[in-house]
């Protein structure tokens, strides 16, 4: 339908009347119309060619549309649960699936063909039969389809669902056996739970009536398998599971977890979820499936299968096999209880029951003797967030930090510590007596320690008598004296006789041995003016010459022989 026709029928003006001057680079090759966008041109060309690429994906509906919005509007009819057309389309899809030659239609009951009939689920309007249950023939490799549940988990053997007693038919080597409704694996939300095929290619026909009487089903019989009954079955299974007391599995009734999709199956055992051993003397057993309450209703990854081990001739056990996936306890001591770090998940908390399978890289396997310990349900949370360095390795290879020795409930793994680990040097205070204190960098030098070239000049009060005129001019406190103050003091001293000038040096030389510590700190004024390095002899001369002479040249003339030791 062109845009002009659309504008006429809807009563709204087309884009050509809104902005006629806008450029229209996309022109129709079959007519004279031009469009603003390429999508509009493509949609218009389909009106000429009659192409309808948008196909309705609902089973039984063969309508096609040229526009995606028309398909979206049409799909709302099928999603309406109260629509009678929905039920009629589902019935038509069921009839067409039986008569067609598709893999889903080749599931008629026979002794040589391996197939599963889900007539109860196919009669439900809300069930989507677009997930075909394809069972290969004898000798073909069996692999579960994408739509099947990738994770299956066992329930305690004392579980029994309160459902109506219906008859199911189990065909083994062409011989039918009547089974109660507990052995009927129900399909919930339109997704097949598993492939039900044995090793020798036998077929499990899960129907409300025998396989030959499928076409003779009445309308009330088909309504018994509606979505309401499936939801009641799921709720009854969940309530029974929550109210179930804790048991300890024994060797006679081992309830083990089914292996995950990547776990290898033991040799000569089943490879498909829900498969049955080829035994002619099988007896009824409980088998049901409930959806994962932790996921959405249409999820295909949360379906669980319930199976138990009854007597020696039960449906899932015989004299040589305990479970269809695990060898007997005499052959292997490894139990999948401990391999995935949890026991029966019926005893796990409500919020963590199915979270173990959603966080698969955080589980750490541990091999034990196959018996559950009496640990609390909080152990499930310990193993849930215990991350492995490599998800495919059997055990962790990364060393955990000593700081995080206890397991944590936080999602942060313990291989990346947030604090200083134990192998780093500990920081201690500076005044810690246990630490070895090294000298600072500023106190270290490559040159040997030297006396400063110009040490401060200090005067000893014992070196001079009280009658010395210059004793009051020099400060008696040990403080440094500048060169200018020394020159002023020496120039202002009065003239003294020569006999009196010898008193000072004699007194200094007599007391020099008792005061060696003070003589090394005295510096001659003449040496300071001349710039020569200090010496003990010159320091003694400075004390005598500075107070015995009056000339500013500070000569030491006759005092030189008296200063030798």
UniProtKB/Swiss-Prot annotation:
**UniProt-recorded Gene Ontology molecular function terms:** DNA-binding transcription repressor activity, RNA polymerase II-specific; RNA polymerase II cis-regulatory region sequence-specific DNA binding; zinc ion binding
ZnF locations on chain (C2H2-type): 26-48, 54-78
Q: Which InterPro entries match?
A: creA/MIG_C2H2-ZnF (IPR051007), Znf_C2H2_sf (IPR036236), Znf_C2H2_type (IPR013087)
Q: Where is the composition biased (Polar residues)?
A: 1-19, 108-119, 276-286, 294-303, 466-478
Q: What segments bear the compositional bias annotation Low complexity? A: 80-102, 391-413, 479-492, 517-526, 537-555
- Residues of the region (Disordered) are 1-25, 79-119, 261-303, 390-434, 466-565
Gene3D superfamilies named among the record's database cross-references: Classic Zinc Finger (3.30.160.60)
Give the residues annotated as coiled coil. none
Where does it localize? Answer: Nucleus
Recorded hits in PROSITE patterns, A to Z, give:
ZINC_FINGER_C2H2_1 (PS00028), ZINC_FINGER_C2H2_2 (PS50157)
What GO CC terms are in its UniProt record? cytoplasm; cytosol; nucleoplasm; nucleus
GO biological-process terms attached to the record = negative regulation of flocculation; negative regulation of transcription by RNA polymerase II
Tell me which UniProt keywords the record has, alphabetically. Answer: DNA-binding, Metal-binding, Nucleus, Repeat, Repressor, Transcription, Transcription regulation, Zinc, Zinc-finger
Protein family = Belongs to the creA/MIG C2H2-type zinc-finger protein family.
Which function does this protein serve? Involved in carbon catabolite repression. Represses the transcription of various genes including the inv1 gene.
What is the recorded name of this protein? DNA-binding protein scr1
Question: Which species does the entry assign this protein to?
Answer: Schizosaccharomyces pombe (strain 972 / ATCC 24843) (Fission yeast)
